[in-house]
From Swiss-Prot:
Motif, Nuclear localization signal: chain positions: 211-214
Top-level taxon of origin: Viruses
Region (Disordered), start-end ranges: 133-176
Function per UniProt: Non catalytic polymerase cofactor and regulatory protein that plays a role in viral transcription and replication. Stabilizes the RNA polymerase L to the N-RNA template and binds the soluble protein N, preventing it from encapsidating non-genomic RNA. Also inhibits host IFN-alpha and IFN-beta signaling by binding and retaining phosphorylated STAT1 in the cytoplasm or by inhibiting the DNA binding of STAT1 in the nucleus. Might be involved, through interaction with host dynein, in intracellular microtubule-dependent virus transport of incoming virus from the synapse toward the cell body.
Signal peptide range in chain numbering: none
Region (DYNLL1 and DYNLL2 binding): 138-172
Lineage: Viruses, Riboviria, Orthornavirae, Negarnaviricota, Haploviricotina
Phosphoserine carried by residues: S64, S162, S210, S271
The gene coding this protein: P
GO cellular component: host cell; host cell cytoplasm; host cell nucleus; virion component
Gene3D superfamilies: 6.10.140.1560, Phosphoprotein, C-terminal domain (1.20.120.820)
Protein name, UniProt field: Phosphoprotein
One GO BP annotation of this record: symbiont-mediated suppression of host JAK-STAT cascade via inhibition of STAT2 activity
Stated family: Belongs to the lyssavirus protein P family.
């Protein structure tokens, strides 16, 4: 009788798939419960209404009065919705920014590049501010008197940022402890730190948030892992990803970033489960190969 041998790595990969499937089912069930929360209340039946309410009827005179009340209520609603001239214009600006954010998300879903969307959005915001927040008369002398203070604050902020950048990040410390090769220069090519770079990194990570990547396991096999299993906020993932050498430069140029390397970096610093599963030496070599391949393109 022939025997069938099963590769242990295939079993582990199957178990990982089952675990991810269970997590997906739980997430779908939670979303369904949240979406149906308004249906869990007890419905109101007409038969259960008080006896007095069944006897109500409206005369023509009462109908006319009711129409006047409705018109007054509509007028009051408009007054409440519209802002008075004396109210803070910053609230209008906040509402405008909220609408801009919704528009950016829609454009990104349609497939447009974020850098192009952001450049157009910046111009629109600048024009909005210049129209709705004109400089009041007599402000020039006030601005001159505050220029020196602004420069001093800017210098202090720059010094604080330089001190923070000089300190090793949590991900870098964990990677070095995990026998990372010394050939990786952890602090190189990460000087350009602006919002457009962060947005580009976040865009690429979000596109592959549920994609599974192969990583070497301690049992001489492989296991699958993705960004969803980190259970981290996207902003926190982007902050950790910026510490990977070369990522900010690639994002600034609009090039693809090594997502498997970024995932391994962030997971090694923040996921205990990942640390228990992964073979650190092989992971370090894979991360180095990914970095070399992407930065040489």
């Amino acid at each position: 009788m022939s025997k069938i041998f099963v590769n242990p790595s295939a079993i582990r990969a199957g178990l990982a798939d089952l675990e991810m499937a269970e997590e997906t089912v739980d997430l779908i069930n939670r979303n369904i419960e949240d979406n149906q929360a308004h249906l869990q209340g007890e419905p109101i039946e007409v038969d259960n209404l008080p006896e007095d309410m069944r006897q109500f009827h409206l005369d023509d005179e009462k109908l006319s009065n009711l129409g006047e009340m409705v018109r007054v209520g509509e007028g009051k609603y408009r007054e409440d919705f519209q802002m008075n001239e004396g109210e803070d214009p910053n609230l209008l600006f906040q509402s405008y920014l909220d609408n801009v954010g919704v528009q950016i998300v829609r454009q990104m879903r349609s497939g447009e590049r974020f850098l192009k969307i952001w450049s157009q959005t910046v111009e629109e915001i600048i024009s909005y501010v210049s129209v709705n927040f004109p400089n009041p008369p007599g402000r020039s002398s006030e601005d001159k008197s505050t220029q020196t203070t602004g420069r001093e604050l800017k210098k202090e902020t720059t010094s604080i940022l330089s001190q923070r950048e000089s300190q090793p990040s949590k991900a870098g410390m964990v990677a070095q402890v995990a026998s990372g090769p010394p050939s990786l220069e952890w602090s190189a090519t990460n000087g350009e730190d602006d919002l457009s770079v962060e947005a580009e990194i976040a865009h690429q990570i979000a596109e592959s948030f549920s994609k599974k990547y192969k990583f070497p396991s301690r049992s001489s096999g492989i296991f699958l892992y993705n960004f969803e299993q980190l259970e981290m906020n996207l902003d926190d993932i982007v902050k950790e990803a910026k510490n990977v050498p070369g990522v900010t430069r690639l994002a600034h140029d609009g090039s693809k970033i090594p997502l498997r390397c970024v995932l391994g970096w962030v997971a090694l610093a923040n996921s205990k489960k990942f640390q228990l599963l992964v073979e650190a030496d092989k992971l370090s070599k894979i991360m180095q190969d990914d970095l070399d391949r992407y930065t040489s393109c």
